[in-house]
């Protein structure tokens, strides 16, 4: 009888703790690393939301500790750390890893996707299931979810960019191999550079321009060291929410289900925030003294023509590249 009473009291206390958001010690503590600063709102806020959902829905059995702002690893180091098991989870950029897995360059194909939602539709339809997910799992990384991260624009310091010829001879920072090739075709001199190094490089004149999404310019305060942006929506980046495969396999099925469901919700949450962000970004840049130009159809046509050979270049890197391109076009 005493044992029954104690059990009932324990259950009541546990129910009270859970309802108030207080949990017992976690059975599984996972380390999540991202280089994103907290100023990268539409990217990092859904990650915090994901971690919170997992904790609540698992009744505290899983706790994900998020280390942001490159506290553990930089953007180009995250995937390797995930493979090795130095961290349990991350949301690396595909663009940063296209040199290792060229198929990731599909998001960087110029003017392939007309909008973030079109890109997300292709991702949700299974774009990465054509081989990318399988290749990563073979290296010990399980992809849980892939989310559209936003289109790349052209930033200039001391000069405007209205046509490809405006980039001729300019030193431009890029983040991926396909974007690098596109800038070469436009006549620029590309150099690979992480977003955290852009401010100082622009300030010192090490680079003259960069191809980056809008969130980089605002999140890194690049408006303080450059004065022109041309909106071209040339290509995209994505973030893939992933977990070390050994970590994943140690989790029981019920907790895997909790984590997967929360991960699936992340992409739609990020998409909504991204679309709102793009509406507001132009005004914020202009308030900070940046000339913000939206490329006209004629101007876009010139850029499209200049960088079109990127497709053939990429096909040379990826034997079944047409499979990815055709799928992307049909599933927007």
Predicted regions and their residues:
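Bacterial N-terminal signal peptides
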Residues: 8-20
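N-terminal secretory/targeting leader peptides
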Residues: 10, 25-119, 127, 134-332
């Amino acid at each position: 009888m005493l044992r029954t009473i104690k059990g009932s009291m324990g259950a009541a206390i546990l129910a009270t703790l859970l309802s108030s958001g207080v949990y017992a010690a976690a059975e599984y503590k996972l380390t999540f690393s991202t280089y994103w600063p907290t100023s990268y709102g539409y990217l990092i806020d859904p990650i915090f939301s994901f971690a919170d959902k997992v904790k609540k829905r698992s009744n505290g059995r899983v706790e994900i500790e998020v280390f942001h702002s490159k506290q553990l690893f930089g953007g180009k180091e995250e995937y390797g750390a995930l493979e090795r098991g130095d961290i349990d989870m991350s949301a690396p950029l595909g663009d940063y890893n296209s040199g290792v897995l060229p198929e990731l360059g599909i998001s960087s194909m110029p003017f392939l996707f007309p909008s973030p939602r079109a890109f997300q539709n292709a991702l949700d339809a299974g774009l990465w299931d054509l081989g990318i997910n399988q290749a990563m799992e073979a290296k010990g990384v399980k992809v849980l979810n892939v989310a559209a991260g936003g289109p790349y624009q052209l930033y200039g310091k001391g000069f405007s960019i209205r046509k490809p010829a405006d980039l001729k001879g300019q030193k431009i920072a890029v983040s991926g191999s396909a974007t690098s090739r596109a800038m070469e075709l436009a006549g620029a001199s590309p150099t690979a550079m992480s977003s955290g190094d852009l401010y100082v490089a622009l300030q010192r004149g090490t680079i003259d321009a960069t191809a980056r999404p809008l969130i980089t310019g605002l999140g890194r305060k690049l408006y303080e060291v450059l004065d022109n942006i041309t909106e071209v929506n040339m290509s995209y980046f994505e973030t893939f929410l992933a977990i070390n495969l050994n970590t994943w396999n140690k989790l029981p099925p019920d907790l895997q289900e909790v984590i997967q469901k929360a991960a699936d919700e992340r992409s739609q949450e990020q998409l909504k925030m991204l679309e709102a962000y793009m509406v507001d970004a132009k005004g914020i840049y202009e308030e900070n003294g940046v000339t913000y130009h939206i490329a006209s159809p004629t101007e876009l046509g010139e850029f499209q023509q200049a960088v079109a050979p990127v497709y053939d270049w990429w096909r040379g890197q990826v034997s079944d590249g047409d499979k990815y391109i055709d799928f992307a076009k049909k599933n927007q």
